UniProtKB/Swiss-Prot annotation:
This is Large ribosomal subunit protein bL27. The gene is rpmA. InterPro entries: Ribosomal_bL27 (IPR001684), Ribosomal_bL27_CS (IPR018261). One of its GO terms (molecular function) is structural constituent of ribosome. Belongs to the bacterial ribosomal protein bL27 family.
Length: 86
């Protein structure tokens, strides 16, 4: 028989690293071509004028300019859109 009480195991004890998602350049900020505007999972924000979308749904500036946000009605709901105005 054991003289010590055996310790149980736990299924906790691990956590993933943060992915640093969110808006990186806010409305009114100047951005250069290729700079990241928003990192996101899925399309919370849609790309607008002079904005491209990467394979991980990251929005980035295609041209140098100023970031602006607006809202468009699409498929019975309002969607947020990001533009880069020259």
């Amino acid at each position: 028989m054991a003289h010590k009480k055996g310790t149980g195991s736990t299924r906790n004890g691990r956590d993933s690293n943060s992915k640093r998602l969110g808006v990186k350049a806010y409305g009114g900020e100047k951005v250069s071509a290729g700079s990241i505007i928003i990192r996101q999972r899925g399309t919370s924000f849609l790309p607008g004028i002079n904005v491209g979308k990467g394979k991980d749904d990251t929005l980035f500036a295609l041209k140098e300019g100023t970031v602006s946000f607006d809202s468009i009605k699409r498929n019975l709901r309002n969607r947020k859109r990001v533009n880069v105005v020259l």
